[in-house]
Amino acid sequence: MRWMSLRWPLSLITGCVLFFASIAAQAESGKLWSAGRYTFSDEMGGFTIIGVSGKGTRQDPIILTEEFHSTTPTVLIIRTEQTNLKDPAEDIGILFHMRVEVTNGSGHPWVEFGFELQEQLNVPSDYGDGLSFYQPGDKKDAIDSYGYASFSDDFEPYDRMIFRDGKIDPGENASFGFPIADFTPKRTFYLVQDPRIPSS
């Protein structure tokens, strides 16, 4: 019985090597999840993205499903290559809608949950940078939560929302819906997520 000799083109071999190398690099740095015009990453740790879907419109928001492993603030990195301005009336582009669905895997109850937008990491986002939870617009019925009954929003000297009047025990879920607008779009910005435990 004769064995057939297989000759693989060098380009095919090189392509396979690069493909598997890219997979390994992505696994090491943290997976990028895509939805709408954006990618989302948990590469800074403290939580894990389980899934992402949606386009970012009000009717079809970007739904981000996460599990939190601790009670320390975590950073979601949001990136886009499409920074061209669009009309906010189109309900997509520089204005998009998100729903964050979280599971408490920290082992501690959460009595509040905060979100803060930052254009530069660890630098408060003020009015001048154009990034906000749609600060100048009508947010009626655009911000809601399952798990907390109320929220407060602070726009200066930072863009922050804190959801209150509820408790998410270990193993339980909560969800938060809100718009994000960036009128001076950048390729990368950050969403700080802050589960809060009882003070005593």
Task: Mark where each language-model region is.
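Bacterial N-terminal signal peptides that target proteins for export
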Residues: 2-13
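Bacterial N-terminal signal peptides
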Residues: 11-21
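Membrane engagement elements in two modes
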Residues: 26-97, 107, 118-128, 148-200
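Buried hydrophobic-core signal for structured, non-transmembrane domains
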Residues: 100-102
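Short acidic/proline- and small/hydrophobic-mixed sequence motifs that coincide with surface turns
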Residues: 108-112
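Cysteine-centric segments in proteins
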Residues: 126, 131-137
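Charged low-complexity interaction tracts in eukaryotic proteins
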Residues: 139-146
